[in-house]
Structures are given as C-alpha cells and as structure tokens.
Design a protein with these regions (language model features):
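Short beta-strand scaffold segments in enzyme catalytic cores
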Residues: 41-43
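Extracytoplasmic/periplasmic proteins that interact with beta-lactams or build/remodel peptidoglycan
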Residues: 1-39, 60-63, 81
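Beta-lactam-recognizing serine transpeptidase/beta-lactamase-like catalytic domain environment
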Residues: 15, 45-86, 91-175
Length: 175
C-alpha cells in the first residue's frame, strides 16, 4: 500500500557554524597529537540543552561516501559507548560539597596511587609525589586518588541520587 506524502514542519538547527568549525579543528588536532583512532565532541548550551556544535573526526563527506570507511558513517558523539572519564568527578565533588561532607578548602594527603580493599590499584594519569591538597586543587588537577578520598566521605546512596539528578543514565534527546 502507498501512503500519501504529507508536508513536514520547519526545522531550525541550533548549530553555530563558526563554533562547529573551530571544534572540528580542535578535535582533529587532538586526534593527531594523541595518535587516537577517533575523537568526538559536543557543545551543549546550559539551560536550554541546545546543541551548538557536534563533531566526529573522520566524518564522511555526504557527497562522496565511498571515500570514507563505513565504520565512520554514524556519529560516535551520540552512538559510541565510552567511559565518561573525569567528567563523572563533578558528581562526586558536587555531592561532597553540597552535603557538607567536604568544603573546597578541605585538605587531603594525595598519593600517586592507592590500593583499594579489593586489591585494585588506582593511580593518577601523571606520576607525582604525595601532596597535601585542597578539594579544589584535587578537582583542578583531576586526581583520581583524591577523588576516591572525597568519595569516601559521601554515602553511596547519596552519590547515586546525585548521579540521577545530573541526568546520568537518561536519554539526552539527541539519540
């Protein structure tokens, strides 16, 4: 059976062309500098959720799809499962400060590595000596070992509530 076509609606894109181009250059440079297989980035306007830029390295040219591997035809920015990395640290720090378990000036002794009770060793990205650091300093340097100590001050149920509050595990609407 045939279904008669109906007129569609007007679509207004929120992509900022200049920002899109700058972000694409930055991602391409980062991929090259880090010898990475690929890279993606998204810029979202806080408050509205509007997508201002969304880029994937090795994006296909729609006019010449044959020149790009089919592995790059989708958008990894919205489809590829990746670890959230250090972006997840914001949740733990926010919960700790908001719940008054720590303040930005609370200090911790922060070693390069920590062995967890289960035997797993967690270390920071770059080697460093043991440092006395504030919570603000730990966040600024993105130290995993400091994060663990801040996280120990926040109950698991509270951190879970904050994760849900930040929208983790929810669809973004871009899918």
């Amino acid at each position: 059976t045939e279904v008669k076509a109906t007129n569609g609606s007007t679509v207004k894109l929120t992509i900022d062309r200049d920002l899109q181009n700058q972000l694409m250059q930055a991602v391409d440079q980062s991929v090259a500098a880090n010898n990475a297989e690929w890279g993606s980035a998204v810029v979202v306007e806080i408050g509205t959720g509007r997508i201002l830029a969304l880029v994937d390295s090795k994006s296909p040219n729609p006019a010449d799809l044959g020149s790009t591997s089919s592995a790059n035809w989708g958008s990894r920015a919205v489809q590829a499962p990746v670890e959230p990395g250090s972006t997840g640290k914001v949740v733990t720090f926010s919960a700790g400060i908001d719940q008054k378990a720590v303040t930005p000036t609370t200090t911790f002794t922060v070693p390069y590595s920590i062995t967890m009770p289960n035997g797993e060793t967690v270390h920071d990205n770059d080697p460093h000596g043991t440092e006395t650091m504030t919570v603000a300093g730990i966040l600024a340097k993105s130290y995993n070992t400091g994060l663990i100590q801040v996280g120990d001050k926040v109950q698991d149920q509270v951190r879970y509530r904050y994760m849900k509050g930040f929208g983790l595990g929810e669809k973004t609407g871009v899918e």
